[in-house]
């Protein structure tokens, strides 16, 4: 299997029990997770040699995050240690018409204040097949944006395939700031992943589609995919399409374009959703595995969508599924019967 590198922040999610609201809670569960950390764990579960690059404090709270990565087989040798803070976020799980809610407390975390000398990106990228990052990392600080650029440059020097999940977060930066940072980084990217909102707010493109209104046909994305491909020279443009009927009932499918053909995956109805956090990251992890191991872009996309559908049934940020489990769902086995 391949050496896959991800760069980003792992945080600690603090969540009330079950569907309790923040204001009624007297205790919180600690759940480690973060975009690129979640991707690293996904590809490690699929048998790849996964490396997570970040910076965490030396104290015990930082060690919680390091241990979470090690537990699921991710190599942590490129996690720098130092600084004072692990990023936190509070997540309240919604139900029915009440949406989930997130409050961030991540300012001045160790990775947000990390310096280039904390990492030897040429050593990190040596022998790697794939490097993945998301728009969350450059959003957390200007220093993290510079680290992202340096990592991308090193990846290109070493012939590494680069993927990005645009992943716009309005609580971290404005669209204007995102466009100014993200567009120059696209010259390093081979595989661009994002939904219709990400394409508009991170790159300035406006697709003719409305997921909230239920318009999730591939035709609404064809023009925008072609524009993105023409401007940035991506090998693949990929988008997930989510229909949100309630906090616990979503429709889920995806599209991929390789410059020649569009492919739309099968559609899943996920009901009930156990935990939506990490759903997009599980898609990215599945797509990376699929593009590395499958014969066609369609097969790769079906693996990614099935992997992500399964993630919605699992508590926590991490997609703790095997290749066989994903293949079974992608192949049509969604009956939920006991596997003996």
Predicted feature locations:
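Hydrophobic faces of well-ordered beta-strands that scaffold small-molecule active sites
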Residues: 162-164, 192
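A short helix->loop->beta-strand "cap" motif at the edges of active sites that frequently abuts
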Residues: 154-161, 232-235
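Active-site metal-binding loops of divalent metal-dependent hydrolases
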Residues: 10, 136, 166, 282
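C-terminal domain-closing interface element
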Residues: 90-95, 322-340
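Glycine-rich phosphate/adenosyl-contacting loop at the front of the ribokinase-like
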Residues: 1-75, 79, 95-97, 111-116, ...
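Conserved post-catalytic alpha-helical subdomain immediately downstream of the catalytic base
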Residues: 263-333
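Conserved phosphate-binding/catalytic loop of the ribokinase/pfkB sugar-kinase fold
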Residues: 92-145
């Amino acid at each position: 299997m391949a050496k896959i590198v991800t760069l980003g922040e792992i945080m600690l999610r603090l969540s009330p029990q079950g569907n309790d609201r923040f204001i009624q809670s007297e205790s919180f569960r600690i759940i480690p997770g973060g975009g690129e950390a979640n991707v690293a764990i996904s590809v490690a579960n699929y048998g790849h040699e996964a490396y997570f690059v970040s910076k965490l404090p030396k104290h015990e709270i930082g060690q919680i995050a390091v241990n979470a990565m090690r537990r699921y087989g991710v190599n942590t040798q490129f996690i720098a240690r130092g600084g004072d803070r692990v990023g936190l976020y509070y997540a309240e799980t919604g139900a029915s018409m009440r949406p989930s809610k997130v409050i961030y407390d991540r300012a001045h975390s160790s990775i947000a204040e990390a310096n280039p000398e904390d990492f030897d990106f040429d050593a990190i990228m040596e022998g790697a097949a794939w490097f993945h990052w998301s728009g969350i990392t450059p959003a957390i600080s200007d220093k993290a944006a510079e680290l992202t650029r340096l990592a991308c440059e090193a990846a290109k020097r070493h012939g590494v395939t680069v993927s990005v999940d645009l992943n716009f977060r309005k609580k971290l930066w404005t669209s204007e700031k995102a466009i100014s940072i993200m567009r120059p980084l696209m010259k390093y990217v081979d595989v661009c992943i994002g939904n219709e909102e990400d394409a508009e707010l991170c790159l300035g493109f406006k697709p003719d589609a409305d997921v909230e209104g239920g318009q999730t046909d591939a035709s609404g994305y064809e023009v925008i995919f072609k524009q993105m491909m023409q401007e940035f020279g991506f090998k693949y443009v990929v988008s997930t399409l989510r229909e949100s009927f309630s906090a616990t009932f979503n429709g889920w499918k995806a599209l991929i374009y390789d410059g020649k053909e569009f492919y739309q995956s099968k559609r899943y109805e996920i009901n009930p959703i156990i935990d939506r956090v990490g759903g997009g990251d599980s898609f990215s992890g599945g797509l990376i595995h699929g593009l590395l191991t499958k014969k066609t872009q369609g097969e790769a996309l079906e693996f990614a969508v099935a992997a992500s559908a399964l993630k919605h049934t699992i508590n926590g940020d991490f997609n703790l599924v095997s290749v066989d489990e994903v293949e079974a769902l992608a192949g049509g086995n969604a009956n939920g019967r006991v596997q003996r």
